[in-house]
Amino acid sequence: ALPLWTFAQEKLDEFNPVQYAIISQTISPDARGASLGDAGAATDPDVNSQHWNPAKYPFTISRADVALNYTPWLRQLVNDIDQAYLAGYYRIGEHSAVSGSLRYFSLGEVQTSDADNAMTVNPYEMAIDASYSLMLSEKFSIAATLRWIYSDLRYDYTSEDNSPASAFAADLSAYYQTYPTIGSRECQLAFGLNISNIGSKITFSGSDAAEFLPTNLRLGTSLMVPIDEYNKFSIALDANKFLVPTPPTMEQYTKETGLSDSQGYDQWVHEHYNNTSSISGIFKSFSDSPEGFKGEMKEIQWSVGAEYTYNDKFSLRAGYHHQDPSQGNMKYFTVGAGFKMSVFSLDAGYVIATAKTNPLDQTLRLSLSFDMDGIKDLLHRR
């Protein structure tokens, strides 16, 4: 699966994005996080924290919650690619929680044919997560996640060598919140970290080389300021960097070997890039950009978001996401709203790209969540 690198608006010799497989793992699954410019490492805990930072779950108010999220994807290009995301958690006592999610990313119907007949295939990606989070103090928690990833991108079912691909991965995350006093108001300040998709490389049929998973480092902070008894305002900032090595360029090959032939370059790439293990790639990713430190900084994606909440029932959100042109140029504003009514919540998010050529423009996300604790109490009253 190819990320949206095709749409970068930069000179070809300056365009050298980090490359990885399983694009669905990089798609924000829920409306709230997406409305905040794709920020979520340290935002107030909610049911969809499984994607952003599962270490937040021990700090949730409700004991159990389930959410269903839906995203029609790339509607500016096609009309049948979408992602469904089911997430839920259960708090065990006052200091720990278990959580999980199921992600299904459909690439729609694709017309193909074998030697005799035309056929329709439905390529897709999916992932199943399970997490355990633990509060180590009244302010700090950690979490570990295990993930099974499955990708069936086959367009030719007649070849014996054509088979789905799968991989295992793990996440490590941490969350810290404190309550400083600003003026006369007790605020909530939080910090979050999530290293996701640490795992094996994945090999697709017909490929000579295994591909990297989208291993990602997410760091974030947020500040919530209560305006009065009913109103509060929060801001969040996330920084994301893929822990995947940068593809070596022909310029690097020429500089190191004094040669410029394509065959030698391909062999050099195979030795210096394709043969890199996923763990080695994590460490290389901090210092392997052809542009040095400047290039490493360009690989960081920034997300900033703001949220206004009234009486914990109604929310308005806005955000901005920035990606350097050399990495894909995905720049867009986001807006959204949320309503909480008794035992369920409904959220919506919308993307407004800075350039109409951005295929993410007008992307809509919908989320529906159920407070299982509230449902249980409601049934007991009856």
What are the functions of these language-model segments?
Residues 9-382:
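Subset of outer-membrane beta-barrel
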Residues 4-8:
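Sec/Tat signal peptide C-region and signal peptidase I cleavage site
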